[in-house]
Design a protein with these regions (language model features):
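Short, Lys/Arg-rich, polar N-terminal cytosolic tail immediately upstream
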Residues: 1-9
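Juxtamembrane extracytoplasmic/periplasmic/luminal helical "stalk" adjacent to the first N-terminal
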Residues: 10-20, 25-108, 125
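Residues embedded in well-ordered secondary-structure elements
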Residues: 45, 63, 118-120, 214-219
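Extracytoplasmic/periplasmic sensory segments of membrane signal-transduction proteins
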Residues: 71-196
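Solvent-exposed, extracytoplasmic
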Residues: 112-117, 240-248
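Structured loops at beta-to-helix junctions and adjacent beta-edge loops in soluble globular domains
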Residues: 132-134, 228, 246
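Solvent-exposed loop/turn segments at secondary-structure junctions
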Residues: 136-138, 216-217, 245-248
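Extracytoplasmic/periplasmic ligand-binding sensor regions of membrane-associated signaling proteins
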Residues: 167-244
């Protein structure tokens, strides 16, 4: 997958800056309070603005580096997930459409993906990573129209140990097989009603997208999702993958 980041990079960075606004404010207030408390506030307004400007430039540079690293890693993640998907389907003699209502094939695919997804998450400075497939394991269920298969991993801490990963979405037995226990609010499949622009995303005619801040179902966690489309060589929309950025 070749993604052109130049056309949307500025708007994406702006959106990330909005999400981090309160952090900037906190840093500024903390600096100001510290200067007052320790009697280091200069006698001129110019001194204060200079110190504040240094802090702002430092934060902005860190955010730019964070975004560049995350964007590059997401490209690699998407390439990896597409390759695993197409290789697994080819080995089983299946088309993507034949994953529908095929629990054995979906099990095999998620089993192949979970370890690689975990490795990308462990290397990232993010709170979660996911791959969501545009198929469902059982279309006879009442809510099957809004359910999609895939794997969603989260970090319990910002460490890099596999023991700190939990399974938020995906087949529980696969997670346990790889030493990853289910989240306390685990569900097997994704609920796409939480993605109001899903039908638009299915067109796959975008490089990447950052969601609005959403609250994860049944939790108090507020997050944004970086979303990159998974599209086959024949134009088939496979699904989405990306990273979770926690507001906390």
């Amino acid at each position: 997958m070749q993604l052109s980041f130049k056309s949307k990079e500025r708007s994406m960075k702006r959106k990330l800056f909005v999400y981090m606004f309160f952090l900037v404010t906190t840093i500024s207030i903390t600096l100001l309070m510290g200067l007052f408390l320790f009697g280091r506030l200069g006698t001129t307004e110019q001194d204060f603005h200079k110190k504040l400007s240094i802090q702002s430039e430092y934060f902005t540079k860190n955010m730019e580096n964070y975004w560049d690293d995350l964007a590059s890693m997401n490209i690699a993640l998407a390439d990896n997930m597409e390759a695993i998907l197409e290789t697994t389907l080819a080995n089983q003699g299946l088309t993507f459409q034949q994953l529908h209502d095929n629990p054995n094939a979906i099990y095999s695919l998620e089993n192949d993906m979970i370890q690689h997804l975990g490795q990308y998450l462990e290397r990232s400075n993010c709170s979660g990573a996911y791959v969501q497939l545009d198929t469902t394991i059982n279309s006879t269920l009442d809510n099957a129209q809004t359910q999609r298969s895939g794997v969603y991993l989260q970090k319990t801490t910002m460490s890099y140990s596999k023991e700190d990963l939990i399974l938020y979405r995906g087949i529980a037995n696969i997670g346990k097989k790889h030493g990853i226990m289910p989240h306390r609010k685990w569900r097997q499949e994704f609920d796409i009603t939480l993605v109001p622009d899903y039908e638009e995303l299915k067109k796959g005619n975008f490089d990447y997208s950052l969601s609005n801040i959403i609250q994860l179902p049944y939790t108090g966690e507020r997050i944004a999702l970086l979303r990159v489309p998974l599209v086959g060589k024949d134009g088939t929309f496979y699904g989405l993958c990306g990273f979770e950025i926690s507001q906390s």
